[in-house]
Amino acid sequence: MEELQRYLEKGRSRQQHFLYPLLFQEYIYALAHDHGLNSSIFYEPVEIISYDNKSSLALVKRLITRIYQQNYLISSVNDSNQNQFLGHNAFFYSHFFSQIISESFAIIVEIPFSLRLVSFFEEKEIPIYHNLRSIHSIFPFLEGKLSHLNYVSDILIPHPIHMEILVQTLQCRVQDVPFLHLLRFFLHEYHNWNSLLITQNKSIYFFSKENKRIFRLLYNSYVFECEFLLVFFRKQSYYLRLTSSGTFLERTHFYRKIEHLPIEHFFVVCRNYFHRTRWFFKNPFMHYVRYQRKAILASRGTHFLMKKWKYHFVNFWQYYFHFWSRPYRIHINHLSNYSFYFLGYLSSLLINSSAVRNQMLENSFLIDTVTNKFDTIVPVILLIRSLSKAKFCTVSGHPISKPIWADLSDSDIIDRFGRICRNLSHYHSGSSKKQDLYRIKYILRLSCARTLARKHKSTVRTFLRRLGSGLLEEFFTEEEQVLSLIFPKRTPFTLHGSHRERIWYLDIICINDLVNHSXLS
């Protein structure tokens, strides 16, 4: 880490980012290896075939040795039969090396982004910790804004069809041309090489979960390009003239040219297309929120305005990124009768009507008031589907045992199930109807009991009778304990005592597979 920090300081002083020499540094691969593989709320850290932490240093050394060998990255295999192509050990090493190299690429590419972020904080004199926003901070924002809006567009941002699009978007911010060529070569070769290991029905290897880090980096660069022009037009809408011939600016030198051009001549892209859509951004009641591929665009305008926005996004992806996006990816609905799925919640607006009796002297009259309330509920069906995928229950929600954990100790089994249950309750603490979570807790509790009974070769009823209430105590969440401190005058909290309280835990800075809409679709 110290050597990496020295390199970052050196790169900051030179203002040039030569990244390709880092590919031959052993500590980069050690950092990628120590970073760990993917984990989620349901799955333990992914274990590659017979992977053992004790052999990590040997594997990293072996990887470096193979990297130094000539033509290692450009070796190709013509045999498409996996059994003939790779034995057990060969598949283990190739799978491991592919993952760790992709992780190393991601770590290296993140360097210029981290430098720019740190310099931005130093220039603006903003403490870094002020930028650490909770994911749950989105929902208080929606609570205050959506109640005054009419329509919402549910947008699913498409993946680029060709990886060259991802490399070109990254080229705007990474100035090391040899490294970009090597990255392009790496993506091309590894896509062809790993395509032999997957069926045609599965997604390409590069977009699989095993390469989540580098995929997230490149995809976020692509999404940033999608949103960059939208944010620019929104901020500058009141400064732009209605008639203009415009000037095309190269995105590679965007930040340098913006300092020398007056704002009235600053029109970023195609004058044949974007000058027709600038008036969209003059609507002050337009709100845009995104997480990963899912975006929400809400407006106080009419259905016609939202329809214009829909085709604006479709044309933007087509002309700027050169790929076709199907219009059905964007759904337009009225907020009063529509529930949209976002960040693991089903959100909607509830209309509350109330009558107030007002009396002035001898006259009295009733005043009917209608207020909108932002409502969030737990998507039980989607949670059960994720539990079924993780082998905790059947598709219908019937709890089953977890045989893969039967070899663990009783305390480890209870701790794993309890941790999953507490994390779920922690994340969905902002739900307005927490009774739905009790079914999920019941599934996990009974699945834990079935796993323990399977381990001890006993029935669930006999095991629960012997264990008593100790198993239930492991599934009490921290939420009841926090609420008992906040509201001490209330009656003691039980398992069902806090279903009316909505609390957004602002210490949540990462989420799990449950909130990823693609994993639940």
UniProtKB/Swiss-Prot annotation:
It is found in: Plastid, Chloroplast. One of its GO terms (molecular function) is RNA binding. It comes from the Eukaryota. GO terms for biological process: mRNA processing; RNA splicing; tRNA processing. Keywords: Chloroplast, mRNA processing, Plastid, RNA-binding, tRNA processing. One of its GO terms (cellular component) is chloroplast. Belongs to the intron maturase 2 family. MatK subfamily. HAMAP family: MatK. Usually encoded in the trnK tRNA gene intron. Probably assists in splicing its own and other chloroplast group II introns. This is Maturase K. It comes from Kniphofia uvaria.
